[in-house]
């Protein structure tokens, strides 16, 4: 991953909500494994983690804010859409559409028709000048349709090769619009 020009950032040591969170331990383990300084953090399920805690652990940025509303999860409608700073930490939120802050997170690509998803990405690019999207490797697995995994149909119907194709078409469209792909570390100016 590192030799391919990709950034390794932390998703914590544990994937619980906040109980057992260990951003410092995760950072140390990843740095030992990769030989690279880990500057970024994104909490599991985009849970709230104190900026002071992350800064004290040595992180430079947090990308755990989804500036939208998700019932029973969080209401971040008043959170900034673009980079802000708190406790010596850059806060780089996940992208949402403009003006209505429709979520552009991983589930959206599964369930939305690609033309609609692209239109929402276009609105975010126009408003914010960047896209900060995230996906999980397991989403691209063809095994999600296996009932043993218990993945809901609304996610598994567009997974594996179907999601790979949709994602490839999204990337090609973004490239055709002149979008530049980079690491978050580079975008925020923390490149080593």
Regions found by a protein language model. Give the residues of each.
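Surface-exposed cleft-lining segments at the edges of enzyme active sites
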Residues: 101-111
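Catalytic alpha-helical scaffold of carbohydrate-active enzymes acting on polysaccharides/glycoconjugates
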Residues: 1-99, 115-192
